[in-house]
Every structure is written in C-alpha cells, then in structure tokens.
C-alpha cells in the first residue's frame, strides 16, 4: 500500500496522475486551492476511491509555506507515511519579458519553482524513511524550448531542471 502525495489535483494533469496511481493501488493525498466541497475535489475523491484505495484532500496554496507544511503533516497523520511525491501545481503566464510586472515575476517564481523546492524539503525525511521514496517535479516542454510570450513560465520550467539536478546530489 503505497502513499502518493500530489499537488494540483482538482483538474488536468494532477487529477490524471491521482487517477493513475489509484488505479495502480496507491492511496492518494491531494491538494489544490479549491474548497473541499467543490465539484472538482469531489471528482478527485471519486476517481481515487472507485479504485478501492483511500483518498485524502486538504486545501492548500503551495505558495504558502505554512499551508503546504500542514498538508504534508496531515498526509502523514492520515496515512502514516509518504512514498512518492508528485509536485504538479503550477500555471502558465502569457506575458513577454517587457510586460511582466515585478509582482507577476515573483508570483511565478514562487508558484512554479519555489513551491517545488519547499515540497521536496518538507517531504524528504518521509521519502528517505520509505526506503523507496520517489520525488517527481512537473515541468514542461517550455524547459527545453522557450515559447514567445511566456517569459516567466519559460524561466521557471527551465529552472526546475536545475533544481532536480541539485536535489539529486
């Protein structure tokens, strides 16, 4: 019975990842910024639990260090461990370098880069204790090919590659 922690489970890749791990027999802890009674959160719970495994959900903004810490701690309280982390939460910002404000720049760095580091740091002791811990940080083709008009997103996705290499040392 593996336990997988996934961020951004209310839609898209995060929901798909949760479904596939549940299908493989893993219990899934998920977070997003959505309220627990939101239809998208109910969909997360349903796709996981229909596979005969347990789900846990806690609303958490991954840019808020305390909310992220609470999510990790509640996951461990619920399941007793974490075997795998899929740090998926993020968003694209369609702005060129010249139009990107300081505020948008820093928010993008926080959401699409720093949140991955925070989550890795928080989960590291549990992954090591697992003995088979796996950490997946979601990136995209923007890490390898900059797309015009996606300035801050391109930068953060490229930086995730460096973050992964540094964490692997």
What do these predicted regions represent?
Residues 100, 146-154, 166:
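Active-site loop-to-helix junction immediately N-terminal to the catalytic Tyr of the SDR YXXXK motif
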Residues 10-12:
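Conserved glycine-rich cofactor-binding loop
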Residues 24-41:
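Conserved glycine-rich Rossmann-like NAD(P)H-binding loop of the short-chain dehydrogenase/reductase
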Residues 125, 169:
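Alpha-helical segment proximal to the catalytic Tyr-Lys
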């Amino acid at each position: 019975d593996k336990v997988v922690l996934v961020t951004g489970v209310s839609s898209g890749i995060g929901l798909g990842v949760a479904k596939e791990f549940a299908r493989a027999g893993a219990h899934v802890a998920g977070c997003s910024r959505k309220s627990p009674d939101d239809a998208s959160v109910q969909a997360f719970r349903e796709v996981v639990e229909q596979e005969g495994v347990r789900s846990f959900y806690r609303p958490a903004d991954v840019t808020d260090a305390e909310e992220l810490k609470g999510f990790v701690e509640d996951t461990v309280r619920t399941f007793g461990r974490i075997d795998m982390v899929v740090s998926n939460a993020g968003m694209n910002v369609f702005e060129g370098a010249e139009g990107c404000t300081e505020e948008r720049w820093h928010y993008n760095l926080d959401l699409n880069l720093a949140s991955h580091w925070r989550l890795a740091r928080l989960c590291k002791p549990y992954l090591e204790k697992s003995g088979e811990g796996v950490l997946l940080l979601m990136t995209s083709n923007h890490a390898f090919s900059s797309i015009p008009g996606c300035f801050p997103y391109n930068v953060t996705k490229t930086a995730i590659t460096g973050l992964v290499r540094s964490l692997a040392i």
